[in-house]
């Protein structure tokens, strides 16, 4: 998404996606892509892109397509990667990730 590439360096995104080829780990992706260094406002903008249906949450289907938000050619996360990602970010147990949970995940890396 052009919104994401206006916030993150495209070269960092490419590097982060290459690291995900063998397996997705959100902490490694957040660090390599530069997400972990972004301000709350920038993270909120990226969250809005990831929240495809604009529900205010990133749900399981949106988590599966997480990498595709950064590059159309990226792969879909498998079920295990998706459930691990959800478990890491869903601090209140509602089976979705809110904007504050997303910001916390980014800053924990």
Curated annotation (Swiss-Prot):
Molecular function via GO: calcium ion binding
Signal peptide feature range: none
Residues that coordinate or bind Ca(2+) 1: 51, 53, 55, 57, 59, 62
Temperature-activity profile: Thermostable between pH 4.0-9.5. Average melting temperature (Tm) across all pH values is 68 degrees Celsius.
Additional notes on this entry: This parvalbumin has an isoelectric point of 4.45.
Family: Belongs to the parvalbumin family.
Stated name of the protein: Parvalbumin alpha
Native source species: Raja clavata
């Amino acid at each position: 998404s052009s919104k994401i590439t206006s916030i993150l360096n495209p070269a960092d995104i490419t590097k982060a996606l290459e690291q995900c080829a063998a397996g997705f780990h959100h902490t490694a992706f957040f660090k390599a892509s530069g997400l972990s260094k972004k301000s709350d406002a920038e993270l909120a903008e990226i969250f809005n892109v990831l929240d495809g249906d604009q529900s205010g949450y990133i749900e399981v289907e949106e988590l599966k397509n997480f990498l595709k938000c950064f590059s159309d050619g990226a792969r879909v996360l498998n079920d295990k990667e998706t459930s691990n990602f959800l478990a890491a970010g869903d601090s209140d147990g509602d089976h979705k990730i809110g904007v504050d949970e997303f910001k916390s995940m980014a800053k924990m890396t």
